[in-house]
Amino acid sequence: MARSRNRKNGAQFYELHCISCGKQVKETESSTRCPVCHRPLDVRYDYDYIRSRLNRYSLRTSPVKALKYLDFYPLLNLDLVVSMDEGGTPLYRCTRLAERTGVRHLYIKNEGANPTGVFKDRGSLVELTKAKEQGAKAVCVASTGNMAASVAAYASIAGLPCYVLVPEGTAIGKMAQALSYGARLIQVRGTYTDAARLAEEVSDRHGFYLAGDYAFRVEGQKSQAFEIIEQLDWQAPAAVIVPMGCGTNMAALWKGFKEFYELGFTERLPRMIGVQPDGCSPIVAAFQQGADQVSAVEKPFTVCTAVAAGDPVDGLKALAAMRESGGCGVIMTDAEILEGQQQLAHLESIFVEPAGAIPIASLAPLLTTGRIRPDEVVVCLATGNGLKDPKAALRVLPSPATIEPTIAEVDKFLKLRLYEIRAAAAKDGGRGLFSQVPSQQTVSKTVREELGVKLTADYAHRVTALVGDFVRKGKGITKADLQYIVENVLKASSEHRPILQVEDFQVTTSLKGKAEAKVWITFDGERVTSNASG
């Protein structure tokens, strides 16, 4: 017999309501948008009913993971739960990063530790369970990549076909995941907004369950807030910094913090700080302008593809979370974000995708403006694993040295300290260094100061010659240019052993006879003679 969670009178313990017009909507009618005004829906609970069923001792003492919060999810049949043991992700206290940034009590919630490497798994737990409750024949989802992989994985566990629509050019790591889980994946020539619109049409036409950044996903993802409170010894932090794309995760976290506050599990609420890249920042822009609506970004352009949602579905919910909590919004450049990604990896050995590094990049301006204080407890949401989009990190990393297999080559690598070469950080890679032909002494000094490499006279001479060639052709030298030149000179200077060398050749021709040719070569140290006619 199915384990029903309805109230004694048979009524559900939750309802779906439109956040704009307030209309109550049956989930069999829609669980995505209001059928009247097409605005997002929200799940409203009977919290007295939840209180009456809640085992507070078990909640406080059982291990941290998403499944322990089943009482807070809108699930009706617990026999149908689709789970991959998501949640229970680590909350790291980052002492080295704290020292560098000046935020003394800095924590990272590493959501990359979820089964598919991203926070989306929490929402997929609820969404795929709802799909099974509703007897879905298939699932359809639009995604910038992370949700595609997560929904595909959970659909596979649930035994449901999964149709995925992603914008063309989605990170290959994310597509590889989704395809490996059995997704029927289509790339759409357009933006995420185009893919999301098309997914809705496909679901309506073919009767598929539409997954995505909708009301039920919010309910699963709010477990991040529950875990943060537990992991901080049942205290809420002063501030939580959240990367935003569609705004769903910001809405989910805020809802989770409010629920634990209202149920008496914590005595305060955090300030919610939303962060976005400057190539796609519609929610923060609306916040900063004091607007009631979110204006869409027609063509997002950012390295943070996971949050490149130009027309955010839950933008209004995210705005409400930031304003209700007394929080704020920050916009960061791609260059600053990639720098933050490297900083987190170097200092704390946490490798996140670019979107997960936006909170790290935002710490400096937040401190400068007084939006966070040095002595406050601050939690940064690291939303996804860096292996989701490894190519992004390579944009600011140096090309590895390539050498011949000799100890002399290794000695040269160590002597020249080639491991010290750092890629021109994206934020200053375009900074001009030379607009006129410099002296060799100036080039050597600049390479040492900018790239950390002390060149020998021979290498300095070659680098100077190439720099001069660039400048004479009217091309000023930036830091990124200098790095490229130095790397290529050092590669070209690597010891090469000739494999094949032509020593001599002789060709004989005549008016009526065939041409005769003879060639003498050295191949791998052995002299070889060859003849041919034709």
Task: Give a label for each model feature.
Residues 421, 425-534:
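Terminal or standalone catalytic/regulatory effector modules within metabolic enzymes
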